[in-house]
A protein has these predicted regions:
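STAS-typified acidic loop motif
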Residues: 2-31, 48-49
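Residue-level detector of intrinsically disordered, flexible termini
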Residues: 8-9, 90, 94, 104-105
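General small-molecule cofactor/ligand-binding pocket signal
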Residues: 4-6, 78, 100
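A charged, well-structured terminal subsegment
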Residues: 98-112
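Amphipathic alpha-helical interaction surfaces in cytosolic regulatory modules
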Residues: 23-97
Length: 112
């Protein structure tokens, strides 16, 4: 599991995750992800290169969203593939965290 950070316009931070977001992957990215969560308030999490999403990974995303929301910020999930999107829907995550298919749609949520 790889994690990369890009700064977008309007103070938006894009976190790009790549690989299997299984338990091992979640453990690898949890600390750097939590550091980003504590420092930034508008975050797009790009899951387009994530091939698998485990329950521990869902927890990492949910906890991050709750922390950001508690500080008045927002987190949006970007471009999950069909399998990952299905897992998010099944877990009810799409009702808790906005999920968008394009970067422009994701950034629009964060700037509204």
């Amino acid at each position: 599991m790889d994690i990369a950070v890009e700064e977008l316009a309007a103070g938006i931070t894009k976190v790009v995750l790549r690989g299997r977001f299984d338990t091992t992957g979640a453990v690898l990215v949890e600390l750097p992800f939590n550091k980003i969560i504590t420092e930034k308030s508008r975050i797009v999490v790009d899951l387009s290169a994530v091939s698998f999403l485990a329950s521990y990974a869902i927890r990492v995303l949910l906890v991050g969203a709750k922390i950001i929301n508690g500080r008045g910020g927002k987190l949006v999930i970007l471009c999950p593939d069909n399998n990952v999107a299905k897992v998010l829907r099944t877990a009810g995550m799409d009702a808790l965290i906005p999920v968008r298919q394009t970067e422009s749609a994701a950034t629009a949520v964060l700037t509204s």
